[in-house]
Amino acid sequence: MGQIEWAMWANEQALASGLILITGGIVATAGQFAQWYLGAYSIAAGVLICLLEYPRGKRSKGSTMERCGQKYLTRAVKVFGPLTSNYYIRAFLHLGLSVPAGFLLATILGTACLAIASSIYLLAAIHGEHWTPIETKPKERPQVGGTIKQPPSNPPPRPPAEARKKPSEEEVAGVPGGGPQENPMPVTDEVV
């Protein structure tokens, strides 16, 4: 059985956590909770987490499906270098971002999810994983001369493939092949 790539699970968990934090922050801010400023913090932290987690990392084996529009955010995440590619840093960043949001009921679910994502990132870092961007390779065009094996010898229009078959030895010798045969008994059409 193959080895589990923990970073993929952590990425999905952290992205969902960011969206949950944004939602809880909107509820807390719009509902004018007593500590509504923690709701505003949760919105900002959720947006930061979503921007950081939207680009998927490349898998070590197999292929990775790129998210829609990921290539633009990948460039931004690559700029920060080891701050974003090291999963130890991501684990502690997520854990630190989740603490203030834990003091508000509307954002406590996002906090719990982000703490779980942080622990999964820590597990991924312990297993030696790191974030590498998915870079699209240019598509190779087939060589025009390399795809044609043998050019056709007959000019168009060509007869169908069955009609172009070379006659077999039996047909050359006069032995009837699979064509029409003569019925040895005469058949008459009698209508009664």
UniProtKB/Swiss-Prot annotation:
The keyword Calcium does not apply. Keywords: Cell membrane, Electron transport, Heme, Iron, Isopeptide bond, Membrane, Metal-binding, NADP, Oxidoreductase, Phosphoprotein, Transmembrane, Transmembrane helix, Transport, Ubl conjugation. GO terms for cellular component: endosome; NADPH oxidase complex; plasma membrane. Subunit of NADPH oxidase complexes that is required for the NADPH oxidase activity that generates, in various cell types, superoxide from molecular oxygen utilizing NADPH as an electron donor. Subunit of the phagocyte NADPH oxidase complex that mediates the transfer of electrons from cytosolic NADPH to O2 to produce the superoxide anion (O2(-)). In the activated complex, electrons are first transferred from NADPH to flavin adenine dinucleotide (FAD) and subsequently transferred via two heme molecules to molecular oxygen, producing superoxide through an outer-sphere reaction. Signal peptide: none annotated. Phosphorylation at Thr-147 enhances NADPH oxidase activity by promoting NCF1/p47-phox binding. It is a multi-pass membrane protein. Residues 134-192 are annotated as: Disordered. The modification Phosphoserine is found at S168. The gene is CYBA. Its main location: membrane. The keyword Transferase does not apply. Residues 70-80 dip into the membrane without crossing it. The modification Phosphothreonine is found at T147. Belongs to the p22phox family. It comes from Tursiops truncatus (Atlantic bottle-nosed dolphin). Residues 31-35, 105 are extracellular. Component of the phagocyte NADPH oxidase core complex/cytochrome b558 complex, composed of CYBB (heavy chain (beta)) and CYBA (light chain (alpha)). Component of the phagocyte NADPH oxidase complex composed of an obligatory core heterodimer formed by the membrane proteins CYBA and CYBB and the cytosolic regulatory subunits NCF1/p47-phox, NCF2/p67-phox, NCF4/p40-phox and the small GTPase RAC1 or RAC2. Interacts with NCF1 (via SH3 domain). Interacts with SH3PXD2A. Interacts with DUOX1, DUOX2 and TPO. Interacts with NOX4; this interaction mediates superoxide generation. It is found in: Cell membrane. GO terms for molecular function: electron transfer activity; heme binding; metal ion binding; protein heterodimerization activity; SH3 domain binding; superoxide-generating NAD(P)H oxidase activity. Residues 2-7, 54-69, 81-86, 127-192 are cytoplasmic. This is Cytochrome b-245 light chain. InterPro entries: Cyt_b558_asu.
